[in-house]
Amino acid sequence: MSLKVGKAVPDFSLVADNGKPYKLSNKIKNKVLLVFYPGDGTPVCTNQFADFRNNEEKFKKLDVEIIGISSNDSKYHQSFKKEHNIPFTLLTDEKGQVASDYNCLGMFGIKRGIFLVDNKMQLKYSHIESVSIFRRNSDEIIDLIKKYS
């Protein structure tokens, strides 16, 4: 599936870190930054979410909710969130179907990617890292949100 800026993104329902279903179309109120990432507890992913956590207020001022998506189960997400004081919802894409729909499924699992989605489920911006050890930092993402919102 090819995602295009200005077009609708695929809706999905996944299990959240609290063990409950999370359906994008039912939860989206303002803007959402979908963050696909390889896995909880890995060095780059931990640094990425710590960076988001440390800049949480900047994202809130822009009415952006951050949602993380990896293949880890909800119990692992809970542990990761607690250990690193991560305030964002983390979703489980165990089989990689949603990652595949968003072109973030690679040979070795979920690839790192970000997708800015507005409250009408329209894609405003997307970026998939070619190598998962790279990531956009919060300042870069905040500038992109301002530019594309």
PLM feature segments, named:
Residues 1-149:
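Chalcogenol-based redox active-site neighborhoods
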